[in-house]
Amino acid sequence: MKGLGSTIVRSLPNGARLVCADNTGAKELEVIAVKNYSGTVRRLPSAGVGQIVFVSVKKGTPEMRKQVLPAIIIRQKKEYKRADGTRVKFEDNAAVIVTPEGTPKGSDIKGPVSKEAAERWPGVSRLAKIIH
């Protein structure tokens, strides 16, 4: 895992629903925790593009549902600013289910992947068809 050059707006708090953008069998995910989050008292933990979160599978195949798994956020609706000054935003909030080491469990990623997530996680960039 590498560091990021841009400032990512952390716009996905606990309870946020995400689209699962891989072929693991999960369709909809809910953020339940953010890994390595240290915040203020009474503030909801939140995450942004390229961060690893723990999710609960809400919709999907019966084998995948009700499981708690780590995932990497690859897209977010809230715009964020890159180091070169451009602003980026996507159509939806999406994540990819991964192993605890950070390698994707699926063999395919649907839709674009943010450049920040691809740079930080080489396993995700290997499966991405579009890096935006």
Swiss-Prot record:
UniProt GO MF annotations: large ribosomal subunit rRNA binding; structural constituent of ribosome
Domain of life assignment: Archaea
Listed A to Z, the keywords are:
Ribonucleoprotein, Ribosomal protein, RNA-binding, rRNA-binding
- Which InterPro entries does this one have? Ribosomal_uL14, Ribosomal_uL14_arc, Ribosomal_uL14_CS, Ribosomal_uL14_sf
What family is this protein classified in?
Answer: Belongs to the universal ribosomal protein uL14 family.
How it assembles, according to the record, is: Part of the 50S ribosomal subunit. Forms a cluster with proteins L3 and L24e, part of which may contact the 16S rRNA in 2 intersubunit bridges.
Know the name of this protein? Large ribosomal subunit protein uL14
**Which species is the source of this protein?**
Methanococcus vannielii (strain ATCC 35089 / DSM 1224 / JCM 13029 / OCM 148 / SB)
Source lineage: Archaea, Methanobacteriati, Methanobacteriota, Methanomada group, Methanococci
The gene it comes from is rpl14
